[in-house]
UniProtKB/Swiss-Prot annotation:
Protein's recorded name: Cytochrome P450 11B1, mitochondrial
Cofactor: heme
Gene source species: Bos taurus
Record's keyword annotation contains Protein transport: no
Cited Pfam families: p450
Highest taxon listed in the record's lineage: Eukaryota
Length: 503
């Protein structure tokens, strides 16, 4: 415990001045008696149609998180942001998140990702919960939760993830020990991406792709390329209404559809294989989420496929980038890294005997992941289309308004997190039982929180556990990494890492 408390931390980006900290406290200014009309809310400057045109021209909005963060500092903790014909409200205080959650209906509404929806409509595929709103969303979500998000489900698939994480560590160790110095400097990002795909497909479909081997099979590589192409084209299509982009970006739409075609073909083959195996007799061992859903038999095959594909598509970048940023922060904060490593070494025997114990035996490592996601939230906003009139920061919010919580600004608000520029995992352990009820929001809140949350958490936790107990992780890069928004928040570049084997 003493080692944790005295671990030195390095700065992690710009922070608000004292004046700005007072402006953006955990609570807004004392509200006047009369609620102010929606039209009186501070508005992000600029022409809403020119803003949309600029986004389309650039086919991205890479600095959106920084632009919105700056706007909060200029306008206060709430403002309107209009793009084209859509009115949005941005907030960044925990109290407003709490009010949004209290106002949640039985089926909270959120924006639908147009490129993904367009593909499914054109091909006649069903939509999974990621692309649904309303009663159908709730029905499917309640049927998925027991086999994906529940603690009993987590206990079942944790050993599968542990096997992949151990293989990753052993493969890396073999490469490191080929060097006489017992160390290796490399770009670890491709290997981490392969790990997340390997682990996720095993949890979902119960099969290994062989991506951690020296020569992965061509089908597995084609699957990776399809996922990469789908995500890249999503970024370039998501910012402009479909009615405009369909004739302005025809090549990109073709690439998007071809990538999805391959992903659906892969999922079809995998699900049919599982279905045929079950038809011959129930497996005597746990063999993944899809098998559990098929055996439960309360969803159609098309619905299972739709939701499995959503989980597949959403399980790669969103897990890989937090892993890489955690390695980066631990590499440039060696005393924090040593404290986390010591925790893993102490718990290793118990986790080796029962991998499920990693969830309870590694509190500091879990706190490090929370700290990474505080500073670098993969999804920079949480959103709700409010179903009834609401008051936020004493402004009237009409029903049907899209409200976005900017996690990037919430996580860097000094009135919410002391010294927010510091990478300090211990803060999450000190805060237990006190402070805001909603400090960790990277996976959303309420009934619409991320369905794949527990899969992602255990994949990150076990990989870091096995890597840190076997290697010292170092980097020469000590400056902050520039983060860009491309559908998710990601590093524009990543430094090389040196892995030194621990004898």
């Amino acid at each position: 415990m003493a080692l944790w408390a005295k671990a030195r931390v390095r700065m992690a980006g710009p922070w608000l001045s004292l004046h700005e900290a007072r402006l953006l406290g955990t609570r807004g200014a004392a509200a006047p008696k009369a609620v102010l009309p929606f039209e009186a809310m501070p508005r992000c400057p600029g022409n809403k149609w020119m803003r949309m045109l600029q986004i389309w021209k650039e086919q991205s909005s890479e600095n959106m998180h920084l632009d919105m963060h700056q706007t909060f500092q200029e306008l206060g903790p709430i403002f309107r942001y209009d793009v084209g014909g859509r009115h949005m409200v941005f907030v960044m205080l925990p109290e407003d998140v709490e009010r949004l959650q209290q106002a949640d209906s039985h089926h909270p509404q959120r924006m639908i990702l147009e490129p993904w929806l367009a593909y499914r409509q054109a091909r006649g595929h069903k939509c999974g919960v990621f692309l649904l709103n309303g009663p159908q969303w709730r029905l499917d979500r309640l049927r998925l939760n027991p086999d994906v998000l529940s603690l009993p489900a987590l206990q079942k698939y944790t050993p599968l993830v542990d096997g992949v994480a151990r293989d990753f560590s052993q493969t890396l160790k073999a490469r490191v020990l080929q060097n006489a110095r017992g160390s290796l400097t490399l770009d670890i990002a491709p290997s981490v991406f392969r790990y997340t795909i390997e682990a996720s497909t095993l949890v979902l479909y119960g099969e290994r792709l062989g991506l951690l081997t020296q020569q992965p099979n061509p089908d597995s590589l084609n699957f990776i390329h399809a996922l990469e192409a789908m995500l890249k084209s999503t970024v370039q299509l998501m910012f402009v209404p479909r009615r405009l982009s369909r004739w302005m970006s025809t090549n990109m739409w073709r690439e998007h559809f071809e990538a999805w075609d391959y992903i659906f073909q892969y999922a079809n083959r995998a699900i049919q294989r599982i279905y045929q195996e079950l038809a011959l007799g129930h497996p005597w061992h746990y063999s993944g989420i899809v098998a559990e859903l098929l055996m439960r038999a309360d969803m159609t095959l098309d619905t299972i496929k739709a939701n499995t594909i959503d989980l597949t598509a959403g399980s790669v970048d969103t897990t890989a980038f937090p892993l890489l940023m955690t390695l980066f922060e631990l590499a440039r904060n060696p005393e924090v890294q040593q404290a986390v490593r010591q925790e893993s070494l102490v718990a290793e025997a118990r986790i080796s005997e029962n991998p499920q114990r990693a969830i309870t035996e590694l509190p500091l490592l879990r706190a490090a992941l929370k700290e990474t996601l505080r500073l670098y939230p993969v999804g920079i906003t949480l959103e709700r289309e409010v179903s009834s009139d609401l008051v936020l920061q004493n402004y009237h919010i009409p029903a049907g308004t899209l409200v976005k919580v900017l996690l990037y600004s919430l996580g860097r608000n000094p009135a919410v997190f002391a010294r927010p520029e510091s990478y300090h995992p211990q803060r999450w352990l000190d805060r237990q039982g006190s402070g805001s009820r909603f400090p960790h929001l990277a996976f959303g809140f309420g009934v619409r929180q991320c369905l794949g949350r527990r899969v992602a958490e255990v994949e990150m936790l076990l990989l870091l556990h096995h890597v840190l107990k076997n290697f010292l992780v170092e980097t020469l890069e000590q400056e902050d990494i520039k983060m860009v928004y491309r559908f998710i928040l990601m590093p524009s570049t990543l430094p090389l890492f040196t892995f030194r084997a621990i004898q």
